[in-house]
Structure formats: C-alpha cells, structure tokens
C-alpha cells in the first residue's frame, strides 16, 4: 500500500541551492521543500513569493516535495 501524504499550500520564502526552497505553510510551519521531477522537467520557474502546493510525508514533517506552483492573482496574462 502506498504511503499517505498530506498536501498543504504555502509561500516560498527563500531559495536555496540545488532546487531546494524554504516554504512557510498556511498553518505557519516553516519546512524545507524540493522540486518534484515533473516540475523540473517542465522547466517551471519557482521564485521567492510564489504560492505552491507541497506534499509532506507523515513520517518527516520537516521536508516536502513541491508538486504544483499556483498562479499569482496579479499576473497580467
């Protein structure tokens, strides 16, 4: 059986080397997030200030995988 993961939304606060980011979740927790392979292959740029969806393991709640970058409300598309 596959491990259940929690999915949270958060804000990128800091960019770290090797595709790692510091993410402040909506519940005010600060965790370390890394970019998932799909986002890396699609060349999606993630910058500080972006809102993201992050998948967190139940066993280690200090690290998570960034699985989606949410669209910003003030973009001029």
Curated annotation (Swiss-Prot):
<dbReference type="InterPro" id="IPR006196">
    <property type="entry name" value="RNA-binding_domain_S1_IF1"/>
</dbReference>
<dbReference type="GO" id="GO:0003743">
    <property type="term" value="F:translation initiation factor activity"/>
</dbReference>
<dbReference type="GO" id="GO:0009507">
    <property type="term" value="C:chloroplast"/>
</dbReference>
<comment type="function">
    <text>One of the essential components for the initiation of protein synthesis. Stabilizes the binding of IF-2 and IF-3 on the 30S subunit to which N-formylmethionyl-tRNA(fMet) subsequently binds. Helps modulate mRNA selection, yielding the 30S pre-initiation complex (PIC). Upon addition of the 50S ribosomal subunit IF-1, IF-2 and IF-3 are released leaving the mature 70S translation initiation complex.</text>
</comment>
<keyword id="KW-0150">Chloroplast</keyword>
<keyword id="KW-0396">Initiation factor</keyword>
<dbReference type="InterPro" id="IPR004368">
    <property type="entry name" value="TIF_IF1"/>
</dbReference>
<keyword id="KW-0699">rRNA-binding</keyword>
<dbReference type="GO" id="GO:0005829">
    <property type="term" value="C:cytosol"/>
</dbReference>
<dbReference type="Pfam" id="PF01176">
    <property type="entry name" value="eIF-1a"/>
</dbReference>
<comment type="subunit">
    <text>Component of the 30S ribosomal translation pre-initiation complex which assembles on the 30S ribosome in the order IF-2 and IF-3, IF-1 and N-formylmethionyl-tRNA(fMet); mRNA recruitment can occur at any time during PIC assembly.</text>
</comment>
<dbReference type="InterPro" id="IPR012340">
    <property type="entry name" value="NA-bd_OB-fold"/>
</dbReference>
<dbReference type="InterPro" id="IPR003029">
    <property type="entry name" value="S1_domain"/>
</dbReference>
<keyword id="KW-0694">RNA-binding</keyword>
<keyword id="KW-0648">Protein biosynthesis</keyword>
<keyword id="KW-0934">Plastid</keyword>
<dbReference type="GO" id="GO:0019843">
    <property type="term" value="F:rRNA binding"/>
</dbReference>
<dbReference type="GO" id="GO:0043022">
    <property type="term" value="F:ribosome binding"/>
</dbReference>
<feature type="domain" description="S1-like">
    <location>
        <begin position="1"/>
        <end position="71"/>
    </location>
</feature>
<comment type="similarity">
    <text>Belongs to the IF-1 family.</text>
</comment>
<protein>
    <recommendedName>
        <fullName>Translation initiation factor IF-1, chloroplastic</fullName>
    </recommendedName>
</protein>
């Amino acid at each position: 059986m596959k491990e259940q993961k929690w999915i949270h939304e958060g804000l990128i606060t800091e960019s770290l080397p090797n595709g790692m980011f510091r993410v402040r979740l909506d519940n005010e927790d600060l965790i370390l997030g890394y970019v998932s392979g799909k986002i890396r292959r699609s060349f999606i740029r993630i910058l500080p200030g972006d809102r993201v969806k992050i998948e967190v393991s139940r066993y280690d709640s200090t690290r998570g995988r960034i699985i989606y970058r949410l669209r910003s409300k003030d973009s001029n598309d």
